[in-house]
Swiss-Prot record:
<comment type="function">
    <text>Acts as a catalytic component of the CCR4-NOT core complex, which in the nucleus seems to be a general transcription factor, and in the cytoplasm the major mRNA deadenylase involved in mRNA turnover. Ccr4 has 3'-5' RNase activity with a strong preference for polyadenylated substrates and also low exonuclease activity towards single-stranded DNA.</text>
</comment>
<dbReference type="InterPro" id="IPR003591">
    <property type="entry name" value="Leu-rich_rpt_typical-subtyp"/>
</dbReference>
<dbReference type="GO" id="GO:0000289">
    <property type="term" value="P:nuclear-transcribed mRNA poly(A) tail shortening"/>
</dbReference>
<feature type="compositionally biased region" description="Basic residues">
    <location>
        <begin position="33"/>
        <end position="47"/>
    </location>
</feature>
<keyword id="KW-0539">Nucleus</keyword>
<dbReference type="GO" id="GO:0005634">
    <property type="term" value="C:nucleus"/>
</dbReference>
<dbReference type="GO" id="GO:0000175">
    <property type="term" value="F:3'-5'-RNA exonuclease activity"/>
</dbReference>
<keyword id="KW-0540">Nuclease</keyword>
<keyword id="KW-0805">Transcription regulation</keyword>
<keyword id="KW-0804">Transcription</keyword>
<dbReference type="GO" id="GO:0003723">
    <property type="term" value="F:RNA binding"/>
</dbReference>
<keyword id="KW-0460">Magnesium</keyword>
<keyword id="KW-0378">Hydrolase</keyword>
<dbReference type="InterPro" id="IPR036691">
    <property type="entry name" value="Endo/exonu/phosph_ase_sf"/>
</dbReference>
<feature type="region of interest" description="Disordered">
    <location>
        <begin position="30"/>
        <end position="82"/>
    </location>
</feature>
<dbReference type="InterPro" id="IPR050410">
    <property type="entry name" value="CCR4/nocturin_mRNA_transcr"/>
</dbReference>
<feature type="binding site">
    <location>
        <position position="360"/>
    </location>
    <ligand>
        <name>Mg(2+)</name>
    </ligand>
</feature>
Amino acid sequence: MYSQTHQQQHVIMNGGQAHQRFGMQMKFQTQNHHPHPAQQPHHHAHHNQPPQHVGHQHNFSSGALASATPHFTPSHIQNGTHTNIDEELDESMNEHWQQQLQLAAESRQASSPHYYARAVAQQTKGIQIAPSQPEAQENGVNQKNGITKTKPASRQGWHALDFGGQGLRALAPSLFKYAFLEKLYLSHNKLKVLPPQIGQLRKLTHLDLSANDLTELPEEIGMLTNLRHLLLFDNNIRTLPYEMGYLYRLEILGIEGNPLEDVLKSLIMKEGTKALIRYLKEEMPVHVPPPARDWLVLDETAATSPDKVSVLSYNTLCDSSATQSHYGYAPSRVLSWEFRRETILNELRAHDPDIICLQEIDQGSYNEFFREQLAYSDYKGVFWPRGRAMGMQEEDAKGVDGCATFFKGSKFILLDKQVINFGQTAVRRPDAKGQDDIYNRLWQKDHIAVIVFLENRQTGSRFIIVNAHLYWDPAFKDVKLIQTAILMEEITKHSEKYAKWPPCTDKAAFRFREAQGEQTMPEPAPSAEYASGDQIPLFMCGDFNSSPGSAAYNLIANGGLIEEHPDLEKRMYGNLSKVGMTHPFKLKSAYGAIGELSFTNYTPDFKDILDYIWYSSNTVHVSGLLGEVDKDYLQRVPGFPNYHFPSDHIALLAEFSVKGKKGKVVEADFGPQRN
């Protein structure tokens, strides 16, 4: 907001021209709003969307302006000219175009320098503002009335800039470093070009470029997915970039006073902003695909290793979750399951890993598509749906998602398979009695993990493959932590059982026949033996919905967590909360070797690392990784899914080599020997 003197200035634009910075807090808004057509409701995005910052919002055509400007009629324009708006209204008599004309008239009224900043200053005049000087401090904390208070964290106090009416011909690059901006007024200037760096201001909700000399908009305008108002009145714009179809929250597109091509103008006149944005989104051509993700070689000697394995993990975004309400920026074709499943299948075949772990695959898609299609590429599969499928009619159960694990049938023998239902496992624990949080918070979540126990046909090495999907909601950190603890506890139990698993005695029955005929295979090695469960190579893949540094992440990486961890919020989960949580495995994230990826989940409102391939570092080491998505490509793509990335998550792929000798050293028995 304004400083108390309203005189703060920065020099960042147009060769040193000064400007005032301002923002307006909601408590300073008056309620005598100028009459305005009702706004369309905000679009509700995906469940990962963070809370919107509404504490500094104001409407361009109401609020401060209602009390700061004289009343005017739409037919009166400040420059002294008159337009017969009534005649134009008679032609359409449409609320959408009537709103366009009203807002255009208001925009033309606002041509004086810093019009909007001055309006806010006028409105807030006389309002008492709390002193900005901090209270006396002692050792970094505030002391008042004998009460010690933690020093509040600093925050950005202003979120809007008004450069209106300054005669600007260019914008300095430093402007686009103000990524916190929510409102930017650049109206009534002489701008001929809007730099593509505008896409960096992704928090903008209001952008006013009216009364300039613009002839086009950059593709990067589509990155501003939080925009509610985009005002382009009185420019020379003839067409709009298809990337504006990404602006699914846009409520007002001010386009009157531009020589816009007929098809676009007709659409916005008759059906309004939402219809035009939807048209641009659906008609958006398929862009040039990004460069292939680099393959990062971490150990060149592994190329000749006789015992290596590649593992892929991928949350594919279940069909029932891929809706316009969650992914309003994506064209309907992009969200269609028929398109996405083919794109996913092609990606899996292109990578051709030894092991595939998929999350959010529904039962119907597994049985009727992926299992059959991947069988042509030598894969066998194991699938379990989430717990809600139990008791459902068969047809209804087809739509329930779960975890699917595929492995190369010519390379591995399936020794065992298990499912872990976190909620059901928790309530069966002896210490669950009387623990209400287990029933009220954990048991209701039906997320699962699937375990498969494999043996390499040729080398005899054995592997435990875990495919997990944890609960998503950040408000349930305790649930994610307990799900992780139960996961590690169950893996520990199964690994000890697998350490005693008998060897395969007749591998001849598993000889692999190539399509073109019988292939001569080397004699298979005997099954490896392991002294304990933590000596068996372990890969734990999935969507853990937990960022690096979270409690769930630290439990896996560090082997344990203290009792009564803060993330539990003093909730009671039996011994897991009373005693603490431990596991015996020495696990590392495969991508930890390069400091993790920039993200594994990418949407306009959420970009973070949620997916991992964990491995037991005492048994295998990482030799290669699939790298980042091209950063230049991401400058014009606000979120996934899109035509090239069929899920809001990206695939992870890592290659490993088994370390040294495996398990027990079995001495050969040559029978009685002569001295």
